[in-house]
Amino acid sequence: MGNLSLFLKKNKKEKKNGYYAATKSLCDDNGKPLEWEIKALTTRETDAIREECSKDVPVAGRQGQWRRKIDSTMLCRKLLVAATVFPDMHNAELQDSYGVKTAEDLVAAMVDNPEEYNNFVEFVQEFSGLESMDDKIAEAKN
């Protein structure tokens, strides 16, 4: 048998935050894209976000049957907000400057280029240890 004390939380290695330039449209004085501080999301965090973005909907033509539906747009936005340490997506001044009232709308306004947005989502998923959507699609095709 192994040493159970090695499994205690105090022995668990924590992943350090990373940095990612989410958009080329926000740059420093030298024209270099600003790096955002990103944390890896935990299983509990991703589960809670997935649950928050899910709802039961009736199955068409099948009375009394329901299926689970995920709002994938909101799921991605909430994952980005939860993973972003800096800039603070909940900052009222930042939200006001973009004319939005929620952190989820702010991240979409700040990273408004679809390709950059998709790359940001993929980075956060991979940094957090989640499979990217491309990986899941490729796996499903095989």
Regions found by a protein language model. Name each.
Residues 1-16, 134-142:
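Low-complexity intrinsically disordered segments
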Residues 11, 23-24, 102, 121:
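Generic alpha-helical secondary structure signal
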Residues 16-31:
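Short acidic-hydrophobic surface loop/beta-edge motif
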Residues 30-142:
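Short, surface-exposed, charged amphipathic helix/loop patches that serve as local interaction elements
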